[in-house]
Amino acid sequence: MKRYIASIFLVLVLFSMELYSQVHKDIEIENKILTAVQKYNENEFEEARAILTEVLLADDGYDAAWYYQAMISVMENDAEFAQECLRNAISLDPENYWYRYRLATLYSHTDQMDLAIDLYENLMNDFPKKSQLYYEMADIYLQNGDYEKALLTAEEIENEFGMSEALTIYQYRIAYLSGNKERALQSLTKYNNQYSSPTILCLLADNEMQEYKDSTALTYYEEALDLDSSFAPALLGKAEVYRITFRYDEYFQNLYIYLKTDGADAIAKTGYLETLLDNCESNFLVSFSPQLDVAMEILTDLYPKESCVYSLKGLYYTYTQRFDEAQLQFQQNARENEDDIEATVTFLRFLWVAEKWKELSAEGLAAFERFPYETLFPEMACIGYYNLGDYNNALECCKTILDNLGEDEQKYASTLSTMGDIYYHLEETKKAYKCYDAVLKITPEDPYVLNNYAYFLALEKRNLKKAHEMSRKTVEAEPDNATYLDTFGWILYLQGKPQEAKPLFKKALLHGGRESSVILDHYAEVLYSLGEYDMAFVYWNLALQKDNGDVPGLKEKVEARRQEAKK
């Protein structure tokens, strides 16, 4: 009996020691996992992964370790391994909501929609009170273009959680995207019959506007303003009703109210006015510039230092041909927002469009000092110098671009193309052609480079066979480009093929060539060589009218041809 009792005691002791050992091991591993989680939260992913890997190598039965391995993989954009880790976590704890939810979202983000849908549907069955699942499920159906299932899911949300403004807008959006406008309006009307919402009223008004039911739209906007007198969409919508019905006094009165409201920010207000300026007829600007000036003053008073207001005013003054005032606005914006690259780019683009080459070159270099990673600025400086005829400084800008390009092969090619043009103007033709050859190795079908290269060879009357082949490619690529047609036609003429050249020039004239003294002169030469003297002099006379020095000695040449024709 004593021996039996002793045996039982020994078993109990051994069992308790084993239990203690297991509990101690679990506590130790849990502490390691907690340390890994802390590292993860501190974005120390490498250290966190090392700890979790050690845990799982010792015992792969810890679901939390697999879960955080997955989260680290997500942060490192390794979706495939993240999915594997989450599946392992779920196999250890199949009821865990977060493991399954994370895997479902990961499937969705990696376009594995069938897997995502299956997992979301299971989650919705197991956790029917989580509204987020329904919305995300509907979004997946939308991405798949399955609007009917998306609408049915939205109806489930309404049945499960009740009607709300946000849900109504969501239902409206889905139905509208599906092309079922009637169903979309039903969702708005259903909500409006039971509740009051300025947002829903504005959506109803917007739909009436699309149907050209201006008076009904105005009624909805006014109802919305009765609920909230400063509701910006209703204020703007009401103003728009007056604008499109040509009631301009009321339009500007309501526009000013909208511009003064706190319900919209500067970006929204300037965005509306920019759209208006971009799309209105020129006579609108002429007729209502005093009223628009007031709108600009309102915005200036409210937002004296806002970049978007400077940009809007610069655009407005440009459209109304007050270029000095426009330049001042763009310049002030760039000066007062020196860290805002977009403000600087907008200013430089204005200088470019306004053809203020001296300012463009200086401001481009100054901008590059502030933004030394942005090669757009030496590009703009190069354009300025090039148009000033300062080819040496333009060339230096190109070299600056090349020194700061990195791996951008396309910009490398375009810069070499510009350098080729510059070298040609500097009469360094070998260097020019070397640049063009380098570009064509990168982009062999570049029509701009092919055309310039071919035309310059034609001007030198050398290697016309190569010039012919390059020019032919440009015309095949852009058959209606007058410049390319002119080059190809001129090469054919130089090759003694004026009859083949003639139709190319006729086509060039149909596509803008009549505005170029060079093209007109070339066509006249072709006609003259074919013995069509009267027509040749018609086009030479047109060339003389258009010429601004583009054809050196044109007047003298035409007179000489006239004398030749009389013999």
Stretches found by the model and what they are:
Residues I27-N31, K260-E281, K305-C308, L312, ...:
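Amphipathic alpha-helical repeat scaffolds of TPR domains
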Residues I29, D63-A64, Y97-W98, K130-Q132, ...:
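Helix-start (N-cap) detector for alpha-helical repeat units in TPR-like alpha-solenoids
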Residues A58, L92, D126-F127, E160-F161, ...:
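Structural marker of alpha-solenoid helical repeat scaffolds
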Residues Y68, R102, E136, Y170-Q171, ...:
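Canonical tetratricopeptide repeat
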